[in-house]
Amino acid sequence: LTAGLTQMWSLSVEVSFYLALPLLAFLAYLLPVRARVPAIAAVAVASLGWGLLPIHTAEGVNFLNWPPAYASWFAAGMLLAEWTVSPVGWPHRLARNPWQIYGIALVAYLISASPLAGPKNLVPATLGQFVVRTSMGAVVAAALLAPLVLDRPGTPHRILGNPVMVTLGRWSYGLFVWHLAALVMVFPMVGTFMFNGDLIVVFVLTTVLGF
């Protein structure tokens, strides 16, 4: 990928999921209602073993970036979707307890930011580190989204539902697309490089140029 756009590999993962979603939804539809959540959870757990498969790729191709490796992330969203139409149970009660659900998100985030999930730089992770990083990413995403979709669904969030936040959310995708290109310009401007400090300056300039 072109320098400054290396994050775009994730788009192929996302688009692949969207293309497969009708088939996945149909397969879930064929299951008994009570079997759907266990089946989706089982697929999520099984996907963490993707790196154990004897897949040989060309140099520079990382099969840990292929869609099946991130099935747990998409499974988290599918589980939340199932729970939105399920009778009130422990997921709903957990989502309505901010201390517990945000505590789970915080702990998972701290684990994903620790050496257990790999070094801070862009060195390829080991299989164990990849499993920790990916699984904790799924937990963080599910924990942050659960209160929004399971606690008073259909009611606009008093903070995230206001026009300013909705607009920023709409713009955020553009920032995702361009933030690395902005970083490529910002680092020479401030005379620093990745993981070497000047966080505030780099953040401000990247945000301005990214938008």
Question: What is each residue range found by the language model?
Answer:
Residues 25-33, 191-192:
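Juxtamembrane segments of multi-pass membrane glycosylation machinery
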Residues 70, 74, 78-79, 100-211:
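Alpha-helical transmembrane segments of multi-pass integral membrane proteins
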